[in-house]
């Protein structure tokens, strides 16, 4: 039964390729990067004086704290990738998973289409996974990451979302809504595994939900810390939820390398009104983006120091 479901994933992949062939994706990415760059440069030139004032709010402790919690979030992501390869029939150690995730994640900054995917699949196959299993594992990881980011964002922002829809945000209403969201999340996690041709046991579903929630907390704190520095007075839960939605839609935006621009725009929208200016919030999100890059490079360095050597030395 599992094998009969696997072609559905191939059909979905073919549909995406038909709608966004590699050349189209590359063109869209190039256009998007140019647009974002022009917007950022124009915005900075026009608002340089006030931007420099905001930058003074970010102490070394704020920057270091942002990098630290982001690295922890990325460690959790590598643990989650360990679960996904296990679902696809191959168990890796934490050191192996941390290295493969960090090395391939850094490649997302290289211009082009699918370097991140190609790097991960190559690393998996070098470690003994078949090409088919490696491709399925990476596809399932991306699906679960998008799903988990959107789910944790919706759960964190349930009260705000209900109020925006004109629905009561009473405790009972919020609780019932969150239960329904969790139920949908469980079903979609299970469905994702089945579409790759692999059965996903209840323990794997529960572990995925826990790990996705933990990574959402730490990655979201990477936004909350800079927001606190500019006196935005945003609660940690709102920052976590807003950034989770931004991450989810950023992952899904095939035209935006590393979700750049999309992640920030969605996060800004989801945060809503604050006690500071919109400009200060935008600068805080920009600081998060830069510190995320620093965290990516640092994670790569850490993973390189602990990665297993070919001769088996530790």
Where are these regions (language model features)?
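Transmembrane alpha-helical cores of Major Facilitator Superfamily
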Residues: 106, 140-143, 248, 290
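Conserved N-terminal subdomain of the carbohydrate kinase-like
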Residues: 104-105, 121
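Residue-level signal for inorganic ion chemistry
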Residues: 84, 112, 134, 140, ...
């Amino acid at each position: 039964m599992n094998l009969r479901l696997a072609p559905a994933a191939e059909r979905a992949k073919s549909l995406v390729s038909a709608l966004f062939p590699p050349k189209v994706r590359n063109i869209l990415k190039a256009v998007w990067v140019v647009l974002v760059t022009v917007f950022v440069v124009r915005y900075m030139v026009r608002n340089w004086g006030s931007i420099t004032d905001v930058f003074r709010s970010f102490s070394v402790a704020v920057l270091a704290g942002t990098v630290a919690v982001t690295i922890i979030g990325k460690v959790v992501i590598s643990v989650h990738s360990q679960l996904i390869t296990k679902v696809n029939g191959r168990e890796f150690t934490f050191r192996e998973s941390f290295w493969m995730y960090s090395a391939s994640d850094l490649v997302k900054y290289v211009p082009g289409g699918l370097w991140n995917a190609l790097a991960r699949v190559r690393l998996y196959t070098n470690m003994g996974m078949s090409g088919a299993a490696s491709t399925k594992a990476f596809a399932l990881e991306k699906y679960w990451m998008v799903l988990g980011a959107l789910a944790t964002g919706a759960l964190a922002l349930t009260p705000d979302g209900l109020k925006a829809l004109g629905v009561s945000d009473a405790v009972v209403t919020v609780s019932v809504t969150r239960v329904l969201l969790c139920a949908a999340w469980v079903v979609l996690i299970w469905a994702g595994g089945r579409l790759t041709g692999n059965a996903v046991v209840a323990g794997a579903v529960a572990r995925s939900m826990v790990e996705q929630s933990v990574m959402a907390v730490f990655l979201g704190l990477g936004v909350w810390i800079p927001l606190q520095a500019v006196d935005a007075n945003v609660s940690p839960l709102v920052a976590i939820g807003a950034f989770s939605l931004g991450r989810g839609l950023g992952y899904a935006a095939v035209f935006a390398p590393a979700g750049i621009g999309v992640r920030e725009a969605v996060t800004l929208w989801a945060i809503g009104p604050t006690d500071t200016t919109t400009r200060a919030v935008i600068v805080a999100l920009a600081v998060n983006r830069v510190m995320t890059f620093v965290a990516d490079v640092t994670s790569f360095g850490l993973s390189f120091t602990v990665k297993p050597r070919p001769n088996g030395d530790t």
